[in-house]
Amino acid sequence: MRHLPFNVQRSMFNVLRNATLSKRERSMFISILLAVTLHATAQKAVVEESVVDVVCDSRTHAIQNFRESTTILNEQGASLAHFVCSCSKNDKLTAFKGQVTDSSGRVIRKIKESELQRTEYSPYLAIDDYQMFFEYTPPVYPITITYEWTIDSHDNLIEFPRFCPQTDYDVSVKKAAYTLTAPKELAVRHALLNIDNTVNVSENAKGSQVLSLELSDLPALKDEPYSRPLRERLPMAYFAPTDFTYYGTQGSLKDWREYGKWEYSLINGSEVLPDAVCQELHQLTDALKTDREKIEALYQRLEKTTRYVAVLLGIGGQKPAPAANVCKSGFGDCKGLSNYMRAMLKVVGIPSNYVTISTTNRQLLKDFASVGQMNHVILQVPLQGDTLWLECTNPQLPMGYVHDDIAGHNAIEVSETGGRFVQLPVYADSANLMHSKIHIQLDSKGAADVSLLQDFHNWQYEHYIPLLKMDEKDRHKTLQRMIRVPQAEIGRMDVREDGATITVDAEVKSQRYATTTGQRLFVPICPIHNGYTTPPTLPNRQEDIYLEAGYLDKDEITLTIPEGYEIEAMPKDQTVEQPFGTFSFTVKREGSEVRIQNSLLMKSGTYDKSQYPQFIDFMKKISGIYSQKIVLRQSKS
């Protein structure tokens, strides 16, 4: 009963001690009370048992047995009732069964292997992998659903299944166990994240090595605002062989250097292009003076002649398609497109490096090399005094722009000498700039013409890329959500892109910008930052405050006072400084105009959870300043 508060445990004990209940009634009572209590604490499920048992009998073959039993407490946990497992021609589902029990332990549904469905992928995808799945909607709550299945894997043991019994917020774990049995001569490495327990290594009666890990009573994680991503908080264990055989290739994962040697063996020789294409590339670039200009020309060619398509073929999806094939077909995945760009650069004499990276994990395990930590490939181009990082799956991005999914991430640079652990650059907080110039022409009835000129740079630029492809109607709807202008009518709206900057130039009319009361106008000082909210109070916050990306918002606002009105009340200048950021607000009258300047710098970083009340106060002050009004009064004649 460790999941329940002490007073609830005591009440349960007293009821059970004094009541005459059958075994089934006791079980039902406990299940119902458990569900009610956990529902009151917003928990949606309990993993009763999560078991992974891997039996590896050689470098090329393993049987993986899984058992998952989960009690789903309410509708919020309904998706946890579904079953899904990844398969391929080398990972076969050989056994499956499932069952659903109600709160009394009565079996209300059995699930057969014949009921599983197989995913149907788009015909445009070149892919070997598929998924077997079953979707189940609980008829009542709570219910317990149990799945057991077996995967037979051969010729692809570059790593063993990860152990991650906790996969979502508001889900606790009662018991979880992982066991890996392997030949003694097969060196197996492991790494633990967010786990205090240790892996036990022993030998069984047959002389095989046995690695085992047990976890119990894991509390549910809460989805708290401004906290680390869930994937960085989950308990997780990695297991992988040091030396491997993978789809007929041989390699080592002793360290990242050895991993890089194997990766290089997959791409070496795949960058050859036909002579006719090479001549075309020289015609395109020979007259250009600098390497950067040549790279730009080839990057634009990549954009115009290729498109992204997922390709999970060739050495388990790890080997890129030959550059000549990508050139001919016009499509490829991140591996194929990056390799094709590498090939074009090589033709014109510019060296580059193939780089593997994760778009989800900012940090790789420096002392534990494994393929599964990465899910993406980009290209690195060393230049004198600079290094370009090319995103080849989306060449619509400005050349060399390091987008949010990879900025600051660890990566592995692959070359003939092996893998090198590197980190991509991240833009300074102040470089993620939104600069707004606004003029508000107010009339005596509270109506206003608002001209808006906004520049979005870098990280803020990424958020508004969708504007570039929207039609006029959708652009207008988006702008209306961005601004604090009641009854906004968008008259004109232009959207321009220049490198990693998007500019929005718009004219907005409002018949009720200011509120009229008698002889007074109450005028909002800031027509933008709509929806700026403060986080909720959390008395028992679990996580430190995490601000992944900092930014700078600068506003220059000019308000023209209507003829016949004078200022009765005006906000005072304010400056707010905290570890998380700084905010300054200034306002002054210049003739018939009021000039307002806002500057908010949010600082990326991790801050102790004890500072959360201070953080809320900081955000409330900013929200309050943005919401201030100037009071205008009709002049006395």
Predicted regions and their residues:
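A sensor for short, sequence-defined functional sites
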Residues: 43-637
